[in-house]
Amino acid sequence: MAKKVQAYVKLQVAAGMANPSPPVGPALGQQGVNIMEFCKAFNAKTDSIEKGLPIPVVITVYSDRSFTFVTKTPPAAVLLKKAAGIKSGSGKPNKDKVGKVTRAQVREIAETKAADMTGSDVEAMTRSIEGTARSMGLVVED
């Protein structure tokens, strides 16, 4: 018989830096999950990813307090900021441009995010990432 799902917990945790402090501790503590077990498993799984990069994770908690989790790719905005070499996006994206990214960088980000995005092809996903870049105040160059 399949285990009964008790809850889904969605978090963004820095790669390789999961610890029992907020937001991980309170979110999993409410569900009765062994927090240290999750932290060790998450840190082991994200070992190959650049430390500190925020990784979305969906944790499935079962009624017997066991859990499984799925990691996703980092948010497009984080990858764009990293590619442009900026700390944050523009407060007025249509007026103040804060950086530049090339179309090749945008395509590379789209290919990285392909597993998580619901686009029909890489071109559609690239256009979606370009829109995110523009809304952050980045200029997309050829």
Swiss-Prot record:
Pfam families: Ribosomal_L11, Ribosomal_L11_N
GO MF term list: large ribosomal subunit rRNA binding; structural constituent of ribosome
Keywords, alphabetical: Methylation, Ribonucleoprotein, Ribosomal protein, RNA-binding, rRNA-binding
Record SMART domains: RL11
GO cellular component entries: cytosolic large ribosomal subunit
Quaternary structure (record): Part of the ribosomal stalk of the 50S ribosomal subunit. Interacts with L10 and the large rRNA to form the base of the stalk. L10 forms an elongated spine to which L12 dimers bind in a sequential fashion forming a multimeric L10(L12)X complex.
Functional description taken from the UniProt entry: Forms part of the ribosomal stalk which helps the ribosome interact with GTP-bound translation factors.
Protein name, UniProt field: Large ribosomal subunit protein uL11
